[in-house]
Amino acid sequence: AMLIASFALAFTACKKEEAVAPVDEAQQALVAPAKDDDAAWRKYLQAVAVQNMGNTSNSPFLYYLAPESDPEFQGKYERQVESATNAMARGVQPGNMLVFGSSASAKMADLIDAAFKGIQPDSMKGVRVLFIGEAGDNARVQSIVQPTGAEYIFVEAK
């Protein structure tokens, strides 16, 4: 919950900056940080999310996994699976954006697979799902998300 709150603050700050200095249509490509740099990855995911907001007006829901080198990785992974699964089960309203990203791209794809199980076809129309990961995981995640009717966006972390 803290992460979402801090993201909302970061997003609000970015919105204020945009009013002062409009961003070019051709936004600069963001470069993914080193695989094990947890703090830099959090900032990177927030920046990519802001660039991909589109018409989404609500603060996005960010699901992030720490690097696999984190000694508590498995526990953090299990908690995020539970959190994302519960959120999907409650339903996601149109106009919202879900952001999934991690240097542990394959594990994030596993998390998305678990969270989206049981989601009714076309029940997420008007929802934007952003996956930030490795190109090798894109097709798998897209095949999981597409039946829900959500708008799927992939950004390669490179």
PLM segments and residue spans:
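Bacterial N-terminal signal peptides that target proteins for export
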Residues: 1-2
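General marker for long, soluble alpha-helical cores
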Residues: 47, 51-56, 64
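C-terminal partner/receptor-binding element of secreted or periplasmic proteins
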Residues: 132-158
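Extracytosolic low-complexity repeat regions of secreted or lipid-anchored proteins
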Residues: 114-141
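Bacterial signal peptide processing site
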Residues: 14-17
